[in-house]
Amino acid sequence: MREKFLTFLAFSLFILPFPFFSGCGPFWVDPYITVKESSLNWVAIHYYNMSRQPIRRIGVEIYGTGTVLVKKGTSELVSNDFAKRSKDANWGNIKTYRIQIDPQAANDIFQNLVNYGVLDREKTGKSSKKEVTDRFIAVKANLSNNTYSDNVNMFEEDPDLAEQLLDVVREFEHPSR
């Protein structure tokens, strides 16, 4: 009887951890992925030049379908669709453009940003260049089910990535008609 009990106990102790670990995997994800073409991919970049008053803002949103939405102006609506200051003098200063590019071109932009570390949370915050700047650029992204949404100034956190983001903004800032 004792032998059966010990066998049962050993088996139970062996099986006990499985319900706790089922579905678990490593808590880290490789931030340098290959972006697969998908309509669910998107990147939103917000750039402010604070050296001028009123602050000049540009927002560029790129979707996996190839749709690019560009907003520019001095209104808070450029970077915040839910802005509240409707009585502000700059409230109506916003222009919105919708551009359609090839989905593969959008995917190439996504892959370039991933290669520069847009999804790498370990990379941000470790920059030795902590210059305070009058420019602000932030990015939010969902690429192949990997997200990044920290609202930090990339010019201060990761200057190399900030320059890549600024290149994307410049690419769509002045759409040709």
PLM region descriptions:
Residues 52-92:
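Glycine-rich catalytic cores of cysteine/serine-nucleophile enzymes that process amide/ester linkages
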Residues 64-65, 99-106, 141-146:
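A short, structured loop/turn motif at beta-sheet edges
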Residues 59, 96-98, 149:
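Well-ordered beta-strand positions in beta-sheet-rich domains
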Residues 10-19:
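Bacterial N-terminal signal peptides
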Residues 77-119:
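A short-motif feature that recognizes glycine-rich, charge-decorated loops
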Residues 1-9:
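Bacterial N-terminal signal peptides that target proteins for export
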Residues 24-52, 119-177:
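Short, well-ordered, aromatic-rich surface patches in folded extracellular/luminal domains
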Residues 62, 109, 137-139:
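Residue-level detector of buried hydrophobic side-chain packing
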